[in-house]
């Protein structure tokens, strides 16, 4: 076993960790074997050094090895998730996109927790709607099979995350755990859209996904946002057949107008709840609908639907039908049986 001191010394010298060292470090983290002052300094050192794809992949495996198993789902399973930490406090676009994608017929497993760095995390929003976020894995699997949508609450699958919650709160900034969050979905989706909070993270995240054997994925950075942008360019790394292709898209590629970031500002869970409810009922503002639609359109690309404009129009029609709220209501009812 590699000692914590030797690992920490390397980090303080801003040296990259080996796969084994990173695995051991995050095994210590998740088992609560690192004191709070050391946690904050280690996370800060990793951030200053910049995390490598090897360190991230090793951390993912360590966390998976300490996570409750989720029953295997037949066929394709999608994930739409952001790292968080972009600092803009927009409405919960990835959560809404997951509900819309499920309504469009794609099975989506949404893994997340309550807010760490924003005013309203994805599961804060779900709770405000009345979703029981602590379903057992077999119940969540059945929900996925019935309604194409399942919510996996982080603390339910890995209670070790409680050991690092205080350090993340103290730091009040994004850390490697923002990067790890989208990668440790216990349902193990094979088609994922991951938004990152920094352009510098696109390639490390994409390389990590290749190392983890993900079938199809896109990593996106939306000019300040950890999702596909409607205000400016979105930088993309697409993964197919273990190859990474980098490109850039803009609102015009989706056939939509350009909007301002302020058009997407969110608030407290109750405020977000009302905004999201209106979107799902087909009564949302144009900017809100567009933001959700482009993110679902990008997911559809992973199912060999390459025409982003057509994808976006299809999604906008589904949103405007109001059927998406029915999907959420079915999940709410199922989760409270």
From Swiss-Prot:
Pathway: Amino-acid biosynthesis; L-tryptophan biosynthesis; L-tryptophan from chorismate: step 2/5. Binds 2 magnesium ions per monomer. One of its GO terms (cellular component) is cytosol. Mg(2+) 1 binds at residues 94, 227. 5-phospho-alpha-D-ribose 1-diphosphate binds at residues 82, 85-86, 90, 92-95, 110-118, 122. One of its GO terms (molecular function) is magnesium ion binding. Anthranilate 1 binds at residue 82. It catalyses: N-(5-phospho-beta-D-ribosyl)anthranilate + diphosphate = 5-phospho-alpha-D-ribose 1-diphosphate + anthranilate. Mg(2+) 2 binds at residues 226-227. The keyword Zinc does not apply. Keywords: Amino-acid biosynthesis, Aromatic amino acid biosynthesis, Glycosyltransferase, Magnesium, Metal-binding, Transferase, Tryptophan biosynthesis. Its EC number is 2.4.2.18. Anthranilate 2 binds at residue 168. GO terms for biological process: L-tryptophan biosynthetic process. Its cofactor is Mg(2+). Belongs to the anthranilate phosphoribosyltransferase family. Catalyzes the transfer of the phosphoribosyl group of 5-phosphorylribose-1-pyrophosphate (PRPP) to anthranilate to yield N-(5'-phosphoribosyl)-anthranilate (PRA). Homodimer. HAMAP family: TrpD. This is Anthranilate phosphoribosyltransferase. It comes from Francisella tularensis subsp. mediasiatica (strain FSC147). The gene is trpD.
């Amino acid at each position: 076993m590699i000692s914590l001191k030797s690992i920490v010394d390397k980090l303080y010298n801003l040296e990259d960790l080996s796969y084994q060292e990173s695995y051991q470090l995050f095994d210590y983290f998740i088992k609560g074997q690192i004191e709070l002052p050391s946690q904050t300094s280690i996370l800060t050192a990793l951030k200053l050094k910049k995390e490598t794809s090897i360190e991230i992949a090793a951390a993912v495996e360590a966390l998976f090895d300490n996570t409750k198993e989720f029953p295997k789902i037949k066929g394709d399973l999608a994930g739409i998730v952001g790292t968080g930490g972009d600092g803009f406090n927009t409405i919960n676009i990835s959560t809404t996109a997951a509900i819309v994608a499920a309504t469009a017929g794609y099975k989506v497993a949404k893994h997340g927790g309550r807010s760490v760095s924003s005013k309203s995390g994805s599961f804060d929003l779900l709770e405000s709607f009345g979703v029981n976020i602590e379903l057992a894995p077999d119940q969540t699997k059945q929900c996925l099979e019935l309604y194409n949508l399942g919510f996996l609450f982080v603390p339910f699958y890995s209670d070790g995350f409680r050991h690092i919650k205080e350090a993340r709160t103290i730091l009040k900034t994004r850390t490697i755990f923002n990067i790890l969050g989208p990668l440790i979905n216990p349902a193990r989706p094979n088609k994922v859209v991951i938004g990152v909070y920094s352009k510098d993270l696109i390639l490390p995240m994409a390389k990590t996904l290749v190392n983890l054997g993900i079938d199809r994925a896109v990593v996106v950075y939306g000019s300040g946002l950890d999702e596909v942008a409607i205000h400016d360019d979105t930088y993309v790394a697409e993964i197919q057949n273990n190859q990474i292709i980098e490109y850039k898209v803009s609102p015009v590629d989706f056939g939509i107008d350009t909007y301002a970031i302020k058009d997407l500002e969110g608030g407290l869970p109750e405020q977000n709840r009302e905004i999201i409810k209106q979107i799902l009922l087909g009564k949302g503002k144009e900017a809100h609908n567009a933001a959700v639609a482009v993110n679902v359109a990008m997911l559809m690309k992973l199912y060999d639907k390459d025409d982003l404009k057509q994808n976006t129009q299809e999604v906008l029609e589904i949103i405007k039908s109001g059927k998406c709220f029915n999907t959420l209501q079915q999940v709410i009812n199922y989760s409270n049986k």
